[in-house]
């Protein structure tokens, strides 16, 4: 399969650079996987597509203010984007500077704080901060908005680039399908008889990396840490027993569940995943999906195509562009039911 098969033209004006005033004010494009039919709705209409007995699985990762500005002790300016917190003081980070820091380099953080560069791991730098890193980031860090938002973060992003159910700090990008849910909608979902469960996948900056190969089979996925607990395994089993559907909120929830069921059976799992889901790969757990609109030629668009079918997905995206839907992290959403016989671009 060619990466170019997943290209579509997206007008710049459709990239959402700010959130709407209300979380649930977004639009919702519903795609019925088995038939390919589309329905244009509001996000609050998601309730109409859920059934009593369904199970919704959310990713409860919490975005950390992972971007730091500062300078080397010698004077050169730099920017740090934390990729992964290793322990109370150490992180792996991307560092942008005119000259890459060498081991032993001391970094002075804008707003207070310092770190030492310990060693390099390919594209990432291992840094040790003089004080506990999570409180430091909360104090002086900036929210790591995606590159396509193309503006400095502001105070509103601290709240809006975060789900209302975020619990476990560690992500450097939001699980954006969850941004549409407010407390009132979550209460209405539970009141309808829909169960909820939470996985954790700490979304890394690699989620924004372009696919740099021509054939998608040659692409190597970035690694992210996830945890699927026994409580989630039990909730999925109970859902299956009562005839309900497993509805994943976001591609990160899909990747978590399918990583924990790689041999076909869902089991508790804690560790790194590099799962790459593209057309032809089976789904063992997820029956329906809530997701935002993704970048052209991205691995997330490939995942959606694997779930809904390639022609159905690309037709839905063409309709979304024509109808002026807002794209990417702060944009609109889709509700998709799984296509039982999905076709790829070469079928």
Curated annotation (Swiss-Prot):
Entry keyword set: Cytoplasm, Queuosine biosynthesis, S-adenosyl-L-methionine, Transferase
Species name: Pseudomonas paraeruginosa (strain DSM 24068 / PA7) (Pseudomonas aeruginosa (strain PA7))
Entry protein name: S-adenosylmethionine:tRNA ribosyltransferase-isomerase
Primary residence: cytoplasm
Primary role: Transfers and isomerizes the ribose moiety from AdoMet to the 7-aminomethyl group of 7-deazaguanine (preQ1-tRNA) to give epoxyqueuosine (oQ-tRNA).
Family listed: Belongs to the QueA family.
Catalytic activity: 7-aminomethyl-7-carbaguanosine(34) in tRNA + S-adenosyl-L-methionine = epoxyqueuosine(34) in tRNA + adenine + L-methionine + 2 H(+)
Enzyme class: transferase
Pathway info: tRNA modification; tRNA-queuosine biosynthesis
Gene Ontology BP terms: queuosine biosynthetic process; tRNA wobble guanine modification
Known partners and oligomeric status: Monomer.
GO MF annotations, alphabetized: S-adenosylmethionine:tRNA ribosyltransferase-isomerase activity
UniProt keyword Iron, yes or no: no
EC identifiers of the protein: 2.4.99.17
Localization in the cell: Cytoplasm
